[in-house]
């Protein structure tokens, strides 16, 4: 970032606001005192500056505008959404500003790295290698920040202090990661440097690796125990920082490393809300693929969709609405389960069968009881009038006289018998027909229940098969994940081994160069001594 600023000539930094004067109008007059009095204005008479114009200006001018004009920078802060700013000043200037007069011999040698090894060893004997300068920097800080791996290795071999903090509470490891000095980072990690120490902004070495999109360094830090959920003072985890800075590749990397997708910043915002506020549709889509919570609210009570609507991010609105529709379809399909419906119908049918079985014996028992009651009434009347024919009614006596000299009760009994016998015959026929109907119903219901039970059994078998398949797939996925982790670890170890080989080669080459230089120095000394001797001899001859 600093390289981009420093690479621009000084003249262009003065011309830039005047070139934009015709477009910026009164906003430029309000923000930049250098543009006042120019007399040019294309903005309305109100004189109020437009925040949307400032955003478009920042997007066009980029980091140049933020560095040259503090009013555009917002005191080192980048706006996200309608409220809640994040301080980006921690990432502005990664390298140290060094003045020669502020450093002693050891610190100069560590910073410049152009001192022979023998001289460094002598310096380390004479002075304290953990000594600090005015900004509380040790020799290890300066060597790591400037990428002088030889000095770093020498200090590590001498067992210097690894986790000393400078004036911004940064360790040598943080400075090496911040300045993207990979060799020094690996050397420090191998010697036990702590990757979870936070600087004054709350950032760890992993935060700076994510900001720089350095996946190799992020892998190495995680391999050596860096905390993937560490939060800085803005409440940003490495994942939230990657989303905020729209670093899609490192966001993918952190998702694979199982970073918490529901982590909240100090304003209660999730990664999805941050991605929506930044207007990054690709990161929003990436997070939606991980089934994140769309309905979560921040401290202001707003959701991701509300931010998308207020910011007029139409593509993101479509993505969120499509995701909600898919989720609703899943929920409806889970609620309307056909297997559960089959179970309910089978239970209802079994209950109906039980009720019909209980009702049929009651009918069977009621009909013979009615016949018994009728027979009892007839027998009682016969007993009453059998011995006393005078007490009979008139219609009965008339019937007796007309009955061929027989008693009056005999024809009456004869006439009553067939009447009493006709009713049971019809009742028996109806009873038998009802019984046949009931048996047919029972058979049909039993057949239906048998069919439904077969269907339930088949459905259960299918469920068991699906569950077995899911279990097998989960086992295979877990096995694949383990294999992937082992491969990643082996890859990292191979990369570290390669870097170690490169370091050894560079050491060997530097040693050879030092030996050659020493030989040249000795040869030069010998030549000088010879010339001095020759000159002395010549002087003695001339004097004689």
Curated annotation (Swiss-Prot):
<feature type="compositionally biased region" description="Basic and acidic residues">
    <location>
        <begin position="364"/>
        <end position="375"/>
    </location>
</feature>
<keyword id="KW-0175">Coiled coil</keyword>
<dbReference type="InterPro" id="IPR002110">
    <property type="entry name" value="Ankyrin_rpt"/>
</dbReference>
<keyword id="KW-0040">ANK repeat</keyword>
<dbReference type="InterPro" id="IPR039497">
    <property type="entry name" value="CC144C-like_CC_dom"/>
</dbReference>
<protein>
    <recommendedName>
        <fullName>POTE ankyrin domain family member B</fullName>
    </recommendedName>
</protein>
<feature type="repeat" description="ANK 3">
    <location>
        <begin position="201"/>
        <end position="233"/>
    </location>
</feature>
<feature type="repeat" description="ANK 1">
    <location>
        <begin position="135"/>
        <end position="167"/>
    </location>
</feature>
<feature type="repeat" description="ANK 5">
    <location>
        <begin position="267"/>
        <end position="299"/>
    </location>
</feature>
<dbReference type="InterPro" id="IPR036770">
    <property type="entry name" value="Ankyrin_rpt-contain_sf"/>
</dbReference>
<feature type="coiled-coil region">
    <location>
        <begin position="457"/>
        <end position="538"/>
    </location>
</feature>
<feature type="compositionally biased region" description="Basic and acidic residues">
    <location>
        <begin position="340"/>
        <end position="355"/>
    </location>
</feature>
<dbReference type="InterPro" id="IPR050657">
    <property type="entry name" value="Ankyrin_repeat_domain"/>
</dbReference>
<feature type="repeat" description="ANK 4">
    <location>
        <begin position="234"/>
        <end position="266"/>
    </location>
</feature>
<dbReference type="Pfam" id="PF12796">
    <property type="entry name" value="Ank_2"/>
</dbReference>
<comment type="similarity">
    <text>Belongs to the POTE family.</text>
</comment>
<dbReference type="Pfam" id="PF14915">
    <property type="entry name" value="CCDC144C"/>
</dbReference>
<feature type="repeat" description="ANK 2">
    <location>
        <begin position="168"/>
        <end position="200"/>
    </location>
</feature>
<feature type="region of interest" description="Disordered">
    <location>
        <begin position="332"/>
        <end position="457"/>
    </location>
</feature>
<keyword id="KW-0677">Repeat</keyword>
<feature type="compositionally biased region" description="Polar residues">
    <location>
        <begin position="439"/>
        <end position="457"/>
    </location>
</feature>
């Amino acid at each position: 970032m600093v390289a981009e600023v420093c690479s621009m000539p000084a003249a262009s930094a003065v011309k830039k606001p005047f070139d934009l004067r015709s477009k910026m109008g009164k906003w430029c007059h309000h923000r930049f005192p250098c543009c006042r009095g120019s007399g040019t204005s294309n903005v309305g008479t109100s004189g109020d500056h437009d925040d949307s114009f400032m955003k478009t200006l920042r997007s066009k001018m980029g980091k140049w505008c933020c560095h040259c004009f503090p009013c555009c920078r917002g005191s080192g802060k980048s706006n996200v959404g309608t409220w809640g700013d994040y301080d980006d000043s921690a990432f502005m200037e990664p390298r140290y500003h060094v003045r020669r007069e502020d450093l002693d011999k050891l610190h100069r040698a560590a910073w410049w790295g152009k001192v022979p090894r023998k001289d460094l060893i002598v310096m380390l004997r004479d002075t304290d290698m953990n000594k600090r300068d005015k900004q509380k920097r040790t020799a290890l800080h300066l060597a790591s920040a400037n990428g002088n791996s030889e000095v770093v290795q020498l200090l590590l071999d001498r067992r210097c202090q690894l986790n000393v903090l400078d004036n911004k509470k940064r360790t040598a490891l943080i400075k090496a990661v911040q300045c993207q000095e990979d060799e020094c980072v690996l050397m420090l990690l191998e010697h036990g440097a702590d990757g979870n120490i936070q600087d004054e902004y709350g950032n760890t070495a992993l935060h700076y690796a994510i900001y720089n999109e350095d996946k190799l360094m992020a892998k190495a830090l995680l391999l050596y125990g860096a905390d993937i959920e560490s939060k800085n003072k803005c409440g940003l985890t490495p994942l939230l920082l990657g989303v905020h800075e729209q670093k899609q590749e490192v966001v993918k990397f952190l998702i694979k490393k199982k970073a918490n997708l529901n982590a909240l910043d100090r304003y209660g915002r999730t990664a999805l809300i941050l991605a929506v506020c930044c207007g990054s549709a690709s990161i929003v889509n990436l997070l939606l693929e991980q089934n994140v919570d769309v309905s979560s609210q921040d401290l202001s009570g707003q959701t991701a969709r509300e931010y998308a609507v207020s910011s007029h991010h139409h593509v993101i609105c479509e993505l969120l609405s499509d995701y909600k529709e898919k989720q609703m379809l899943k929920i409806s399909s889970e609620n309307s389960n056909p297997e559960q419906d089959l179970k309910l119908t089978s239970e209802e049918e079994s209950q109906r069968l039980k009720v019909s079985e209980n009702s049929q014996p009651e009918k069977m028992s009621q009909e013979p009881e009615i016949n018994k009651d009728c027979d009892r009434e007839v027998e009682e009347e016969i007993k009453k009038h059998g011995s006393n024919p005078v007490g009979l009614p008139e219609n009965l006596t008339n019937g007796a006289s007309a009955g061929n000299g027989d008693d009056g009760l005999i024809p009456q009994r004869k006439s009553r018998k067939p009447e009493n016998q006709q009713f049971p015959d019809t009742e028996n026929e109806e009873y038998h027909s009802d019984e046949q109907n009931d048996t047919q119903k029972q058979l049909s219901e039993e057949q239906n229940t048998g069919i439904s039970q077969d269907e339930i059994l088949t459905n259960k078998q299918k469920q068991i098969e699906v569950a077995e398949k899911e279990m097998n797939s989960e086992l295979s996925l877990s096995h694949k994940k383990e294999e992937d982790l082992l491969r990643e670890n082996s890859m990292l170890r191979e990369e570290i081994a390669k870097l170690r080989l490169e370091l050894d080669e560079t050491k060997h080459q530097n040693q050879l160069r030092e030996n050659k230089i020493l030989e040249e120095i000795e040869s030069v000394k010998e030549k000088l001594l010879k010339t001095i001797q020759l000159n002395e001899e010549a002087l003695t001859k001339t004097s004689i």
